[in-house]
Amino acid sequence: MRYLFAGGGTGGHIYPAVAIAKEILKNEQDAQILFVGTEKGLEKELVPREGFELVTIEVQGFKRKLSFDTLKTVYKAFTGFKQANKILKDFKPHVVIGTGGYVCGPVLMAAVIKRIPTLIHEQNAFPGLTNRLLSPFVDIVAVSFEDSVKYFKKAKKVVVTGNPIREELLRVKKEEGREKLGFSMSKPLVVSVGGSRGAEKINSTMVELLKIKDRKFQVLIITGSSNYDKVLEKVKKENVVLDDSVKIVPYSHEMQYVYAAADIMICRAGAITLSEITAVGVPSILIPSPYVANNHQEYNARLLERQGAFHVILEKDLDAKKLYEKIEYLLSEPSLLNEMREKAKSMSRTDASYKIYQLVKTIT
């Protein structure tokens, strides 16, 4: 069978598609899989790296305010729709699966018009605009949270599946992760990561935190590729001493080692990040991004904070002193860390990819 995936922009839309595609290949070795994305999204790099073919179309998101860019967006939407139609005609997929991002719009609507079976997956507790608009037309809407079902009242069918995660994340032990990353087992490891695009406020706060003397834990800062040079410049400008207990890297393509090695994660609250840290069971301090549509990251974070697995600090309240005190408090309470770890794991759904594969088989 031929499977077409549409999704992109950030890792949060790409990695679920990759996880589902790998699940398909596990069950159907002869399956043909094609991804559709854009030239500017992270899919341009990540999809080929995962071993899948990617074709691109022209599309961009609508701005909140009317402007010349709005006209450009409308023009690109028509262009993208024509390009999507050609891809469907050439590839002849048996099913089209959308995992979010602007690219889903033209591809999924073209598939609906051609009466090709369709499924979309929503990662966030509060759904994105593209998926909300597509939901009345597609065959199945798969959601990650029970809380999301109420937003898809006009959908034909809504199923709670959880978020698909990559199987390799669950296979690494702490010792293996520490060795791979070059950290000692003798001290705790705190990891900060701002998502696939990075997070300037988290990065700058972590650099400030490195100035605090008598720090008893190791630090890994994953800056995001676009922020790496800026972070190194700040380190140099402010004469921050980096010893063997600190590493700063732009990005990691092997998050399985990072999650396994970490005692505490400091991260955004994107849906895929949350799915991964719950599956692995990493106690985390969540800093929801205030720059996302409908403030969905805080919505995600508060939903899980209420379960006792994570602590939340809003970006407007974030500073090095507050973050350091929170880290020190958690590290001084091993029983609390263990409790957070267990509560996180209890909320995870590690079979989401298989559930979605089973749903796909019901419409093909």
UniProtKB/Swiss-Prot annotation:
Gene3D superfamilies found in the cross-reference section: Glycogen Phosphorylase B
UniProt keywords, alphabetically: Cell cycle, Cell division, Cell membrane, Cell shape, Cell wall biogenesis/degradation, Glycosyltransferase, Membrane, Peptidoglycan synthesis, Transferase
Gene Ontology BP term (one): lipid glycosylation
CDD domains assigned to the protein according to its UniProt record, in alphabetical order: GT28_MurG
The enzyme's E.C. designation: 2.4.1.227
Pathway note: Cell wall biogenesis; peptidoglycan biosynthesis
Enzyme class: transferase
This protein's GO CC annotations: plasma membrane
Subcellular location: Cell membrane
Recorded topology in the membrane: Peripheral membrane protein
Any one GO MF annotation of this record: undecaprenyldiphospho-muramoylpentapeptide beta-N-acetylglucosaminyltransferase activity
Primary localization: membrane
Positions contributing to UDP-N-acetyl-alpha-D-glucosamine binding: 10-12, 124, 166, 196, 297
UniProt cross-references to InterPro entries, sorted A to Z: GlcNAc_MurG, Glyco_trans_28_C, GlycoTrans_28_N
Signal sequence bounds: none
HAMAP family attached to this UniProt entry: MurG (MF_00033)
Family: Belongs to the glycosyltransferase 28 family. MurG subfamily.
Function of the molecule: Cell wall formation. Catalyzes the transfer of a GlcNAc subunit on undecaprenyl-pyrophosphoryl-MurNAc-pentapeptide (lipid intermediate I) to form undecaprenyl-pyrophosphoryl-MurNAc-(pentapeptide)GlcNAc (lipid intermediate II).
Name of protein: UDP-N-acetylglucosamine--N-acetylmuramyl-(pentapeptide) pyrophosphoryl-undecaprenol N-acetylglucosamine transferase
